[in-house]
Regions:
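Bacterial N-terminal signal peptides that target proteins for export
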Residues: 1-11
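Bacterial N-terminal signal peptides
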Residues: 9-21
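A "functional boundary" signal
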Residues: 23-264
């Protein structure tokens, strides 16, 4: 499993949905028109939620330059409305989705330019789940440009902040990011150590199933690279255990208000 290939597949899988039959295109346009009409009459949090739904639709079409331009305009409008209402959570979500849109289009320099200010915003307003998600995207941008030293420096910052807060999910995310850097550098033993520690922490929290699943996948890759096949097979029973999220409800906000839109 090559990280770059897998990551590219994840980031661009949404493009498969761009070639749609006319009926589907008409349905999307109808949704857009309905949401734009609703925007004219909405107020308060309802208006922010409508912006949220509308730009989600355009994010799925961001491979088209014209749709990307429209999406950026929507982000600007949603940001202005969130600032007007004093809703820092929705403002932070706009910033995060803007970064995801740049990543999905391989605009890595844009991510590197914009992300640091957004990370500062998340820190000031205690939006830590957003912070970890978008710090991961900054690290991803450096990785995809081959700037592994800068990627490692950012992962180190993430881990330090999480450790200071005794935030196990944040520490696990930073270790996951570091493990990916070692994978790209073909350092399987260090990669293994990072993913083992990340997995150990993730089993103590909920709401991070995607990172937990991918950590197991990368751990298998690192063991295979070291020809430790018996240990690889021993991982299977652990991977079949119920996830942390199935043992207790995830912490945090509802999907509408608390999650950055991520392509999987």
């Amino acid at each position: 499993m090559k990280y770059r290939t897998c990551l590219t597949t994840l980031l661009y899988s949404f493009l498969l949905g761009l070639i749609l039959p006319a009926s589907a295109q008409n349905s999307l346009q109808h949704q857009k028109d309905s949401l734009r009409y609703a925007l004219e009459h909405a107020e308060g949090i309802d208006k922010l939620q409508i912006y949220n739904k509308l730009y989600y639709i355009y994010m799925a079409e961001a491979g088209d330059d014209q749709k990307m331009d429209t999406l950026m305009t929507l982000f600007e409008q949603a940001e202005a409305e969130a600032i007007r209402q004093g809703d820092t959570q929705m403002q932070g979500m706009v910033y995060g989705n803007r970064i995801i849109s740049y990543i999905n289009r391989s605009e890595h320099d844009k991510v590197i330019e914009k992300a640091p200010a957004y990370l500062d915003f998340y820190i000031r307003h205690d939006l830590w789940k957003f912070y970890y998600q978008i710090h991961m995207q900054l690290i991803t941008a450096y990785n995809l440009k081959g700037d592994y030293e800068l990627a490692a420096a950012e992962a180190g910052k993430m881990y330090t902040r999480a450790r200071e807060r005794k935030d196990k999910a944040g520490m696990a995310t930073a270790l996951y990011a570091t493990g990916i850097i070692y994978n790209l550098q073909r350092r399987p033993k260090e990669e293994e150590d990072c993913f083992r520690e990340s997995i150990s922490l993730l089993w103590e929290v909920s709401g991070y199933d995607n990172i937990l699943t991918q950590s197991y996948a990368f751990l298998c890759v690192s063991l295979r690279a070291q020809a430790r096949y018996d240990e690889l097979l021993q991982l299977v029973p652990n991977m079949k255990k119920p996830s942390p999220a199935s043992r207790k409800p995830p912490a945090g906000c509802s999907p509408k208000l608390g999650e950055i839109f991520m392509w999987h």
